[in-house]
């Protein structure tokens, strides 16, 4: 590979990072596996604590030669270096939590006249470490455990732990000590930045840092299993690697300096049950740069899933900013529909193949176009319209029936259902509605559903549905014209389109006359980043083969420039 091509390849590994941000902002990753439900979903998490998280199953796992070097290593990706710049590193070096912890340790060292390094905390972060993070109820990765390894760690920390007997910020907790073999390991608490605190325990050359005592408690009792997991981590057992199907990083294997693994349980953003095939993604940095992988679950999670995404790309109008195509399994969507309709059993087997979502620069973040495959009988073909009528809409108290009517039309071979729905975030002003006096908001969406032959189309933006119908009728170009036909392509990213979409959304949400401070901040800080983003080339993610087998199959990803 030439230096130029290699640089281009590395450049796009960074698009994965931006892709994650764009997905989470807009709900793009509505595609991964489930924790519970019908028989084709995965087994549920095992909860052993008050936080309702499974300590064996992190949402995000880091395995690093040096946590403090991770931000700098990420910037070796040309894309991230161009878009994020050195500000990204400075942000983490000067984060309030980091500065608060360092300040607390320095005060303890000074007041207790300890012979410890002034940069103790920084030196700990510069050691080999593993970090596991879990999301809270808001979806933020606020719960964590960090396992740090350093030669002579216990001896190094002895003076600091001795100070815990008489310090206002550092103290031994009332948590029952962690048992490792015949030894008892106490748990300490360090308070910083006022009411913030972290817990830690040390054993031989390892330190386990965690965010809350609730990680080890269930109700008001310390949980035996959760405490045992903490003990296993301190004693060297590889619980987290095993849960992601990862081999241990060893000197004999290809060196990996940084490893980031993200579970679909977090990336799914609440929609995992529809797409149980995907397990997660992984990014690794070795001597030759960054590499990326996608993981599949075992075949029992989606026996009949289809990885043929050609029908999706044939139906999607060209010009998309961001697209994702995913398989789905029979039975899961139908089971979820049972909560809103008594006729869900009539849909069995009708939802078929693969589905896709695309965002367009002239639309909105909250109005992607959905394309699915429907292979049902003539009777079943009426069910999507019934479900649309029953479940799509807003309460319009001024409307005679409490909701605006659905219009059903025939356009060639397509059946189309539309309903105007009030929303403060709507695309159209009230004056453009068919019955503006019945709307409860000054804006509205013209939500649309269409079915033509075996293709199902849905969007809050009726223009996108109209464009897709034109694509099906061969009067508008399709995404298949730009998507490579060799290999499996589940992801398409157009940085220029993404930049325009995000720019429009930002300026719409921050009117200059109403939000002058945030508007100026966006102009100064965000717009230059979007300008840099728009200069990046388009890429697709390609997979050579995608057949479910054993759990956590890791398949290499190829990023192909267009």
Curated annotation (Swiss-Prot):
It comes from Escherichia coli (strain K12). This is Uncharacterized protein YfaA. One of its GO terms (cellular component) is cytosol. NCBIfam families: PRK11410.1. It comes from the Bacteria. It holds the Pfam family DUF2138.
